[in-house]
Design a protein with these regions (language model features):
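Short, Lys/Arg-rich, polar N-terminal cytosolic tail immediately upstream
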Residues: 1-7
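Transmembrane helix-loop junctions in multipass membrane proteins, especially transporters and channels
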Residues: 34-38, 65-73, 109-114, 182-186, ...
Length: 225
């Protein structure tokens, strides 16, 4: 029992460290955004640091993820061939994501739910440095977040390939994803959690992280259009 607890705590710490590495990288872009108008040359240096560290971090994530799968892979994660049927499933799941967001917008417009607390800050940051913030949100954030909240998460927890672990893992992955996007227990967290659950289902359905990354990419791209 003690061994299992220590094993679980070790995985929690590792996931936190991986998340901290990603947040540190995104913080560099926040600094660049904050100095974009007051010190443009400094902002460009931080953009360079963001891109270089993102490249290194991405290489680390890919290496560690593959190493995990080589050591233990009871769910047989790997590469699933891209076929018309798989594209159709991804697009159907994307429509489900849009439906969740449409429902959420209706609840906000009708003053049933409050708007996200961070919405104003996100819009202000985008206006300060639109190209780099949008590029990061669309291309880099989906990759890092899918590795953390889906790839590494399911390599650390709920590893057994059985229905109970699958559905509980989808729920917990979604809740962690939702909480990390709001840092609060709120209706907004449940909204993000629903999106996270759909992405987790996509990852487990295809057993290929490229599909959940593609879905996350489509979602973030739609958000800026």
């Amino acid at each position: 029992m003690t061994h299992k607890v220590l094993h679980w705590l070790k995985h929690v710490v590792l996931l936190i460290l991986l998340l901290a590495a990603y947040l540190t990288n995104s913080f560099l872009l926040e600094v660049a955004t904050a100095t974009a108008h007051s010190a443009p040359s400094l902002a460009m240096r931080f953009i360079g640091l963001t891109l270089m560290s993102a490249a290194g971090l991405l290489a680390l994530f890919i290496w560690y993820y593959r190493r995990q799968l080589q050591a233990e892979n009871p769910r047989n994660f790997g590469k699933t061939p891209v076929r018309f049927n798989s594209i159709l499933i991804v697009m159907t799941t994307f429509i489900a994501l849009l439906a969740v967001q449409f429902l959420w917008m209706l609840l906000i417009v009708n003053h049933i739910l409050p708007p996200p607390d961070n919405q104003a800050a996100v819009e202000a940051a985008t206006n300060q440095l639109p190209f780099w913030n949008n590029a990061y949100d669309v291309f880099l954030a989906p990759i890092f977040e899918e590795f953390i909240f889906r790839g590494f998460f399911f390599n650390f927890f709920f590893v057994k390939n059985r229905p109970r672990d699958t559905w509980l893992g989808i729920l917990m992955s979604g809740l962690v994803f939702g909480y990390m996007h709001t840092l609060s227990l709120s209706p907004t967290m449940l909204f993000y959690s629903a999106l996270g659950c759909l992405m987790a289902w996509t990852y487990l359905h295809f057993k290929d992280i490229r599909y959940s990354i593609a879905l996350h990419f489509l979602n973030n791209l739609w958000a800026i259009l």
